[in-house]
């Protein structure tokens, strides 16, 4: 049932439109933030795609890939966090198209001038805005969600201010807890709070679909 709750929250956090878009995940991509919300790795474990609504989106991610060194050994290359904004209007599928990253020279060139493509289901390029997310170090470590909020409020090249506002409002409602993850039993009150809030925000059609889905779920 806890997994079902997370699926419900994911479905309700995003506006629902007539069209839906499938974001295909790459094994070389570590997705950090989606539309202003931190995405937990445990939530994505084993998933090869995410369903998005039709409209503007923003993702923050890193590329993690083994590259060859000059001595023929390998090491894990981790890129800086990248911000990509795009619009999926009337697009049914989004695929990552990453540049070649096989050795130190190619990874260094990518660090100097990052570039990625997003392709639709017909392998046609989707217009994107790409930038590097500046990170703020804190005693608690890196907070990608907070850094994304600051980025969006700063009016940068790939900023989407609407997601910064949505994130701030949701964080206040949820007492600062906004990581989309499987919620432990002791936090069921928070789960209920989330579900009630997003249910109230949804349109009648979305509420009906959610209630139909909930009736089909096991009680425990």
Curated annotation (Swiss-Prot):
Family matches, as InterPro entries: UPF0319 (IPR018635)
Q: Which residues form the signal peptide?
A: 1-20
Write the record's keywords in alphabetical order, separated by commas.
Answer: Signal
Query: Has keyword Chloroplast?
Result: no
Read off the Pfam families from this record.
DUF2057
Q: Domain of life here? A: Bacteria
The entry assigns this protein to a family as follows: Belongs to the UPF0319 family.
What is the name listed in the Swiss-Prot or TrEMBL entry for this protein?
UPF0319 protein Ent638_1476
